[in-house]
Amino acid sequence: DVCSSDLAEIITIGDEILIGQIIDTNSSWLGQELGKLGIRVIHRTSVSDNKAHIHQALQEAATRASLVIITGGLGPTKDDVTKHTLAEFFNSTLVVNEKVLEWLKQIFTMRKLPMLESNLEQALVPACCDVLFNRSGTAPGMWFNGEKTVYVSLPGVPFEMKTIFTEEVVPRIKERFKLPAIYHHTIQTVGIGESFLAQKIEAWENSLPEHIKLAYLPTVYNES
């Protein structure tokens, strides 16, 4: 089925984001890339590594968007609970994906490192998802077709997330969603504050059709 809605939500998962230990650059990058595809991000949510909090965020996102991108919580340690929560959310069980398992074995063989039990668990994925290959790391991405909403779960490591999104997610989005063309035009002004400019063009701005949006982005230049 083709989705006609072009609204998306981004959910970032991880205590390290909420306590300010790391800066969430994934959302900004995803927002830009989704915008290029004609998909508007209307909501961003950050939640802790807590099953109940993640489950609530997944439920609420479905009321707002037809595409939900989730990053984080796919690592091999016990605090990474995203995959288990998604399995419960979709009433699914975790199964071993043989392709992922083989890829994990190749990685650890190349690195000449032993595989721990926690590493093997990264080959476990919800039975109901489409696995998104991660050639840049060990945690695969996952694509879930919900009743009205598509959920995509990606690793929180930026370069892994970007690789999977570009190579695996974008082609699926183009196939699944009816995407509008979006054009951005920048008009630069100098010597006038945004409030004065807004007053001058108020009548023109009010006459714009609903599908055309105007944003004021003031920048202050300091000459040294």
Residue ranges and their predicted role:
Residues 149-224:
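An accessory alpha-helical subdomain
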Residues 7-55, 59:
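ATP/NTP phosphate-donor binding region
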Residues 13-15, 70-78, 155-156:
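Glycine-rich beta-strand-to-loop/alpha-helix junction loops that act as flexible
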Residues 65:
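An anion/phosphate-binding loop that grips the pyrophosphate of nucleotide cofactors and donors
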Residues 53-56, 80-177:
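Proline/glycine-rich low-complexity loops and linkers
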Residues 1-4:
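Short, small-residue-biased leader/transition segments that mark boundaries at the very start
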Residues 46-49, 99, 120, 156, ...:
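Short beta->alpha linker loops
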